Regions:
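Subtilisin-like serine protease catalytic core
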Residues: 111-241, 258-259, 330, 341-342
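Substrate-binding/access-modulating region of protease and related hydrolase catalytic domains
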Residues: 231-313, 329-345, 349-355, 364-366, ...
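Flexible, acidic/histidine-containing loops and adjacent segments that form or flank the divalent-metal
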Residues: 142, 147-184, 255, 318-327, ...
Length: 439
């Protein structure tokens, strides 16, 4: 029976077949098939001493959170430990770069009466890395403004308290800079292959040396702390388990140095209720109250894409949500979020007009076949970190691709009090052009 101390996606992943997990774009995130180990985020209470052992590795974080690596066979038993309050599956992260310095009126803040430049504070980023040779991240004497760089993708010498990656100090980075690019990058081999992290840090804190002061960032006189997310794997996009450890590292560094810090997060995803109740979101809320800390997030790149639908359903009313699926779509999923107290009948219709429903409101996975598409559906039930109910629908190809055309999700109000509902598709440009909800 599904465990209500485990989030919906992890429950579904445990119940899905290996073939279903391979076809899904979500269910295997956090799982290493080579070692058969899962990375998960947990919230716990009490001492951390009893969390590890017997092939279970734990990275304790601030505030009673931790990242745990454990065998798949141990997940259910581990969740039943008294000190484990909740367990959450990692989610894949995507770029959410924002470029709004002018629109934010930052220049007037920098040049006004107070002349705020970031001097004396720390700017931290958790992203795809940084080009530490870039002039905008170097002082006038050529030395680095970066005090610490934790590259999670290079194994060797992780920071104290963590188990992955390599930490580089300002002294090591300065030595690499003095050697020049060819020799220096051998000493400190951390790179930013996508350029996303370098752009983000430039907007947040670049000093403008590369452009003679024209393209200065917001806090251009601040000192810098950088975390490059990522563990080498087939799919290079990072996960929430890496993000939460990066935030934890930055906060601990700021506390050790006794300095205020602003953290920029320009990675994200569309998964969740968008009410701030995931473990990652509650962790960010918690650490935001520690010390002198501000956490800033990007607004995303999906504002003009048809990835969200919502409305209010009245009792006895029927709503039809139309979803266009373009050709050659290998997989997709839909999250439907609503209040637990609202009872709705849910039907799904494929482009050929064949329909299933009403879906059973029961714990555990439900499986249906419509045309050449398999539907894997999970009804979420109340849990300690679930403020709203999730109905998760995975569209899996019977052969190679999900059936293209116009799908319909039909909602019928049975016993309705509030009636609000929201549907989300994955973001991060993971879907083909033409896939999305109709306006």
């Amino acid at each position: 029976m599904p465990d209500q101390k485990i989030d919906n996606l992890l429950n579904l992943a445990m119940d899905a077949t290996p073939q279903e997990r391979r076809k899904s774009g979500n269910l295997n995130i956090g799982y290493d098939p080579a070692t058969r180990l899962w990375d998960v985020i947990i919230k716990y209470s009490g001492p951390e001493s009893g969390l590890a052992g017997n092939g279970i590795q734990v990275v304790p974080l601030l505030g009673g959170y931790a990242v745990v690596t454990l065998p798949e066979s141990e997940i259910d038993e581990y969740s039943h430990r008294a000190q484990v309050e909740f367990m959450e599956k990692p989610k894949r992260l995507y770029f959410e770069l924002f470029q709004a310095k002018g629109a934010s009126c930052i220049r007037t803040v920098q040049t006004g009466r107070n002349g705020l430049t970031g001097k004396g504070i720390l700017t931290g980023v958790v992203d795809s890395g940084v080009d530490y040779f870039h002039p905008d991240f170097r002082n006038a004497d050529g030395s680095s403004r970066i005090l610490r760089l934790w590259d999670q993708s290079i194994q060797g010498n992780p920071p104290q308290g963590y188990v992955t990656g390599t930490e580089y100090t300002k002294e090591q980075i300065d030595e690499a800079l003095a050697l020049g690019e060819n020799q220096g990058r051998r000493l400190v081999p951390s790179s930013d292959y996508s350029g996303h992290g370098t752009s983000v840090l430039g907007i947040a804190a670049g000093n403008g040396r590369a452009s003679d002061g024209v393209n200065q960032g917001v806090a251009y006189e601040s000192d810098l702390l950088v975390v490059k997310m990522g563990i080498p794997r087939e799919n290079s996009f990072p996960r929430t388990t890496e993000l939460i450890q990066g935030i934890d590292y930055l906060v601990r560094q700021a506390l050790t140095m006794g300095r205020p810090m602003a953290i920029n997060l320009s990675f994200g995803n569309n998964y969740g209720s968008h009410k701030g109740d995931s473990l990652l979101e509650t962790y960010i809320d918690m650490v935001s109250s520690i010390g002198r800390l501000a956490i800033c997030t990007g607004t995303g790149n999906n504002g003009n894409q048809p990835l969200h639908e919502g409305g209010t359903l009245k009792q006895g009313q029927t709503r039809q949500i139309e979803l266009s699926v373009s050709s050659r779509e290998p997989t997709l999923n839909v999250q439907l979020w609503k209040s637990y107290e609202d009872e709705m009948s849910i039907y799904i219709e494929n482009p050929s007009g064949n329909r299933i429903g009403p879906l059973d409101e029961k714990l555990g996975p439900q499986r249906y076949r419509l045309g050449n598409t398999d539907l894997l559906i999970y009804y979420g039930k109340p849990g300690p970190y679930h403020l709203t109910q999730e109905i998760y629908i995975d569209f899996l190809p019977g052969k190679t691709y999900v059936d293209s055309g116009d799908w319909k999700i039909i909602l019928s109000g049975k016993k309705v009090r509030g009636g609000e509902y929201y549907l989300w598709l994955p973001g991060g440009n993971t879907l083909n052009r033409g896939t999305g909800f109709y306006e």
